[in-house]
Amino acid sequence: MAETGRNQGSGLAPNIASVLCYVAAPFTSIVFMLVEKENKDVQFHAWQGTVFGVGTIAVLFAIEIVSWILGAIFSFLGILIGFLVPMVWFAAIIVWIICVVKAYQGERWKLPILGDMAAQRAGI
């Protein structure tokens, strides 16, 4: 579960460092991935934050591209697909809040599929 004590690289408590991995993911998570090499909890949250952040950006980008393409062909399809963007944002914010709360509690809460990838990369 959670490792106690202070982190070696940043000097932050592990739960605070884990929360910061999600604050501006994937950017902050990459920083903690490089700085906190010894703490497996922080490494897990850093990897999960990176994969979640990049994945969210990729999905939103893909929806926008598909919306533009279909909008050029059939305007109503572009508009319908364009409605997915706010729904994806809302879902991502809910998942982000859950990740932040669980990280603060010192829990390794795994996102489906992404959590297993993060655990593998973190060496857990």
Give residue ranges: language-model regions.
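Hydrophobic alpha-helical transmembrane segments in multi-pass membrane proteins
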Residues: A17-V35, Q48-C99
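Membrane-interface extramembranous regions at the lipid-water interface
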Residues: M1-G55, V101-I124
